[in-house]
């Protein structure tokens, strides 16, 4: 089995001035993920997503959008397709890398989804250091929040930066998907988007692994990640499945976004209906990852 990792850094109207930062970010994530693939697809996805959580170019981890209360509030999920084990966290304020906590939930908890203070308590029990929310806030987002507080609603120009995700196939045929997000700008505190919802923003089976990005409420209605997986299981190529799912998102649910998918055979697909989507592909046969927006 030839290992492969796909990365996305969000589907939106990335301005020219931010293209280079996004290309660099997804490239670094792909490199981190490929190193992890030497061990397993789980390690690869965790490493890739963690890299983007640490990069303020993306709406995940440090530098995420602030909610109405002026706080960073994060969601993440990871799922292994063959065994269908998964872990998810939502609305956490004190976790630097929520994808790492999601993995702890997957491996060491008897439930799938933990939120808020309960998730943070579990993190402490698992040896994950809690951080101050202030440490996740950057000045750019503090200034954005001040403007949005005056406006009372997010203007179109503030829908910037995106959810991050990765899907991977390892040498043993393991398929894993992971997604992490800071959510929408000036969101209602406690809002959970599509990203950590299995079947909506993220999904994996023995056939494929999928991570989505875009406007969460529409993606949840479309059950987008599961739609991609169902199409693959019905015999569609990865690319066709991705494109058809994005088409459904737009036509039936008036939604915008994108997705990445990799199958058990190493076939992969990338599709989006926004002006741009940061993404990268890295296979064992490549000397370097291929990244684009």
Regions found by a protein language model. Name each.
Residues 1-293:
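Alpha/propeptide regions of enzymes that mature by internal proteolysis
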């Amino acid at each position: 089995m030839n290992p492969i990792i796909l990365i996305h850094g969000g589907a939106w109207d990335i301005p020219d001035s931010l293209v280079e930062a996004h290309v660099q970010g997804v490239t670094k994530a792909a490199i981190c993920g490929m190193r992890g693939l030497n061990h397993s697809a789980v390690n690869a996805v965790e490493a890739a997503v963690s890299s983007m959580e640490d990069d303020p170019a993306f709406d995940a981890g440090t530098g995420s959008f602030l909610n109405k209360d002026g706080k960073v509030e994060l969601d993440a999920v990871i799922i292994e397709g063959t065994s269908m084990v998964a872990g998810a966290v939502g609305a956490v304020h004190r976790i630097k890398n929520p994808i790492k906590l999601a993995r702890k939930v997957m491996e060491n908890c008897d439930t799938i989804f933990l939120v808020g203070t309960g998730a943070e308590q579990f993190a402490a029990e698992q040896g994950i250091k809690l951080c101050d929310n202030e440490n996740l806030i950057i000045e750019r987002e503090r200034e954005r929040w001040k403007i949005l507080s005056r406006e009372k609603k997010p203007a179109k120009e503030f829908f910037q930066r995106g959810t991050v995700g990765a899907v991977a196939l390892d040498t043993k045929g393991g398929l894993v998907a992971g997604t992490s997000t800071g959510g929408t700008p000036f969101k209602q505190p406690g809002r959970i988007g599509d990203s950590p919802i299995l079947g909506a923003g993220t999904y994996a089976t023995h056939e494929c692994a999928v991570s989505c990005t875009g406007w969460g409420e529409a993606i949840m209605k479309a059950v987008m990640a599961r739609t991609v997986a169902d199409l693959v299981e019905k015999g569609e190529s990865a690319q066709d499945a991705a494109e058809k799912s994005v088409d459904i998102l737009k036509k039936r649910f008036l939604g915008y976004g994108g997705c990445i998918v990799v199958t058990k055979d190493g076939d992969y697909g990338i599709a989006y209906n926004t002006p741009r989507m940061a993404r990268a592909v890295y296979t064992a046969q490549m000397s370097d990852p291929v990244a684009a927006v």
